[in-house]
Amino acid sequence: MVGALELEERPQSLGEEIANSVSHGIGLLAALVAFPILVTAALQRGDLGGTVGASVFAITMVLLYLASTLFHALPACRAKRVFQILDHSAIYLLIAGTYTPFTLGVLRGAWGWTLFGLVWVLAVVGTVFKALGGVRYTTFSTWVYLAMGWLVLIAIEPVWTLVPKWGLFWLLAGGIAYTAGAVFFMAERIRYFHFVWHLFVVAGTACHFLAVLWYAV
C-alpha cells in the first residue's frame, strides 16, 4: 500500500494547486446547485428510470468535484494522497454516472441494460484498481477513461434513434471536451496543464448536465 499512496510524479506548485482547487471548487458549487435541479425535474416527470439515473449522475458529479477539490486544496500529507486516489477513482464513477440516466431513462431494453452493465463493471474494476495500485499507470487509466466514454459508439444506432438530436449534440460536445482535456492531463508535466484539464472537465460536465436535464429526465 505504500506504493499505492504515491503522489503523481511532478508535484504541483502552490500557484497550480490554487488554480486546480479553485477551478474544481467552482465545479463543486455548480454540481451542488445542479443536484436538486436534476432530481426535481426527474421527479416532476414521474419516470423511475429517469429519476434514478438523474440521481446517480448528480451524486457522481458531486463526488468527483468534492474529491478533486479536497485533493488539490490539501497540503502534502497522507490525506492528500488518499484524496488523490479518490479523485482518480471518481472519474470512473462520473463516466458511469453520466451513462446511467440515458441507459435507464432513454435507451432502456437490451441496449440500455447492456451499456449500463458494461460501464458500471468497468467503473468498479477501475475503482478497485486505483484503490490497490494507487495513481501509478496514469496514462493507462486515461485511455480506459476515454474508452469508457466512447463505448457508447457500440450502441450508436439505438442512441441515434432514441436520443433527440440536440441531446446528441450536448453529449458529443461533452465527450469532445473531456477527450481534448485528456491531452493536457497526460501532459501535465507542463506547468498549469493540469489546470487546463480541469477547465475542460468543467466544460464537459456542463454539456452533459444539459443533455441529462433536457433530454434524459
What are these regions (language model features)?
Residues M1-V217:
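Multi-pass alpha-helical transmembrane bundles in non-GPCR membrane proteins
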